[in-house]
Amino acid sequence: RGLGDVYKRPELYQAYNTLFEKHWEEQTGQKVRIIQSHGGSGKQALEVANGLDADVVTLALEGDIKTISDSGLIDPGFTSEFPDDSAPYTSTIVFLVRKGNPKQIKDWDDLLRSDVSVITPNPKTSGGARWNYLAAWYYFEGQGESEEDITEHMKTLYQNVLVLDSGARGSTTTFIENGQGDVLIAWENEAFLSMQEEPGEYEIVVPSASVLCQPTVAVVDEVVDRRGSRAVAEEYLNYLYSDEAQKLAGENYYRPADQDIAKQFYTEEGTHAVSYTHLTLPT
């Protein structure tokens, strides 16, 4: 049986798919082949809504899945279909800077400086980029700024963006491989992966305010009912909450929804933004 999967992060799901294929065969005796599509969350949502057959979607934010739901492909109430508002893991927004932090970037207001060039994806195509936008807005709102002033700050910030890639991975490539920009606004897991892949070349800066990002998962009801794949699709998403999959999420620098497993990967560091945690690099 084939399972079409539109997803957010290639490394996590490449490993998870192997885990799930083994699990499904052990449980049912059936082999399953998972066909994947990866890209900016907003763009992926539009492609599914416009006819790309996917049995399941794992996207950056609830709103992208609502786009598919609004097209009639996913039943309303999808956030209650799985535990933790159908978010099996979470992340937050941090800054990735080059070794030594040469521009001394500490917080969101530093991204408004004329000498700082920023890399972040395009909020029109990337769900992750919308979390970046919200985190910046949240910071300025916390400074007591008016909506008018915050809007001007956001304009300034985006005027400092060198390249608006369509997705988070494209922005990481622009910053890491192409060497463009002074700071990458990134999901925590993306920042840690970059540090793992290029040891000693980058540093993570934790801004004073951020947001808790909740990637959402859903079964595409119209597709699974038409294809007769509901059982495997639902189990694919349910198994994300298994101990094995939760550990895999932590190993890929996400914050597992299972708090007992999450504790294996973080140390507490409080801020006023969220109940903030730092994932430590797995040994």
PLM feature spans:
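Alpha-to-beta junction loops
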Residues: G51-V57, V116, N178-V183
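Solvent-exposed loop/turn segments at secondary-structure junctions
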Residues: K8-E11, S41-Q44, G63-K66, N101-P102, ...
